[in-house]
């Protein structure tokens, strides 16, 4: 299956279809969409975003705690879409503040 992903970036919204077995960051990059990242392994906060709608599987991540996940934080480098999703990107400063 694939789902509609909407990324709300500082440059405006970007929408694309993303297969449910491809990380959101990886697919965005293939489409030329610029999202920050560093480790690509779910163990830092560079790619952090805020889930506005929908759900993701980010079970490979090791950085966020349960409370942050409940608040809607998502690491796009290890997040698979599990429904149509809307994510605000470029949120690392807010997460680590």
UniProtKB/Swiss-Prot annotation:
This entry carries the following GO cellular component terms, namely: chloroplast stroma
User: Where this protein primarily resides, as one coarse class?
Assistant: plastid
Molecular functions per Gene Ontology: 2 iron, 2 sulfur cluster binding; electron transfer activity; metal ion binding
> What are the residue boundaries of the 2Fe-2S ferredoxin-type domain, all occurrences included?
3-93
Q: Which UniProt keywords apply?
A: 2Fe-2S, Chloroplast, Electron transport, Iron, Iron-sulfur, Metal-binding, Plastid, Transport
| Binding-site list for [2Fe-2S] cluster | 39, 44, 47, 77
Name its cellular compartments.
Answer: Plastid, Chloroplast
Instruction: Please give the cofactor(s) recorded in the UniProt entry for this protein.
Output: [2Fe-2S] cluster
Query: From its record, what is one biological process in GO terms?
Result: ferredoxin metabolic process
Q: Which residues form a coiled coil?
A: none
Comment on bound cofactor: Binds 1 [2Fe-2S] cluster.
Q: Which family is annotated?
A: Belongs to the 2Fe2S plant-type ferredoxin family.
Function summary? Ferredoxins are iron-sulfur proteins that transfer electrons in a wide variety of metabolic reactions.
Task: Name the chain's protein.
Answer: Ferredoxin
Q: Tell me which species this is from.
A: Sambucus nigra
């Amino acid at each position: 299956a694939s789902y509609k992903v909407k990324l709300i970036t500082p440059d405006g919204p970007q929408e694309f279809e993303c297969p449910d077995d491809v990380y959101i960051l990886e697919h965005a990059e293939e489409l030329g969409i610029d999202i920050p990242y560093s480790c690509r392994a779910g163990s830092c906060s560079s790619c952090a975003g805020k889930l506005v709608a929908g759900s993701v599987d980010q079970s490979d991540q090791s950085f966020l705690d349960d409370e942050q996940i409940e608040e809607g934080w998502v690491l796009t480098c290890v997040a698979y879409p599990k429904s149509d999703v809307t994510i605000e990107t470029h949120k690392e400063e807010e997460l680590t503040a």
